[in-house]
Amino acid sequence: MKALMLLTLSVLLCWVSADIRCHSCYKVPVLGCVDRQSCRLEPGQQCLTTHAYLGKMWVFSNLRCGTPEEPCQEAFNQTNRKLGLTYNTTCCNKDNCNSAGPRPTPALGLVFLTSLAGLGLWLLH
């Protein structure tokens, strides 16, 4: 009887944990999440959220499911020396727990829109 209860509990836990979903997209200023999807976590994996910053300015976020090939490893202030970007990665294991990321920086949105307007004027001449 105990073995049957243990087996039932194990199957139930596997079924519940197998249905955990994560957000999956690249979030950029002004546009928000690009190609928003949902991914299903594999057993033993976690949702990942990586935020990239240039100095203190948020540049983009990458939301995804961890995989056996790329398991979630929390890291703070990892720097890419070539690009000068700083990355912060967080992990979580609840349904849709990796949020869509920080709000866009207003100054960056203004720079982006001004650049688009300038490009449009240049193309018209």
From Swiss-Prot:
Propeptide position ranges: 100-125
SUPFAM superfamilies listed in its UniProt record: Snake toxin-like
Localisation: Cell membrane
Tissue expression remark: Highly expressed at the leading edges of cells, on filopodia.
Pfam families: UPAR_LY6
Membrane topology: Lipid-anchor; GPI-anchor
PTM notes: N-glycosylated.
Keyword Glycoprotein: yes
Signal peptide: 1-18
GO MF annotations, alphabetized: identical protein binding
Cystine bridges: C22-C47, C25-C33, C39-C65, C92-C97
Glycosylation sites per record: N88
Gene Ontology cellular component annotations, sorted alphabetically: extracellular region; plasma membrane; protein-containing complex; side of membrane
Domain UPAR/Ly6: 20-111
Subunit annotation: Monomer.
PANTHER family, sorted: LYMPHOCYTE ANTIGEN 6 COMPLEX LOCUS PROTEIN G6C
Entry protein name: Lymphocyte antigen 6 complex locus protein G6c
Species annotation: Homo sapiens
Gene that this polypeptide is encoded by: LY6G6C
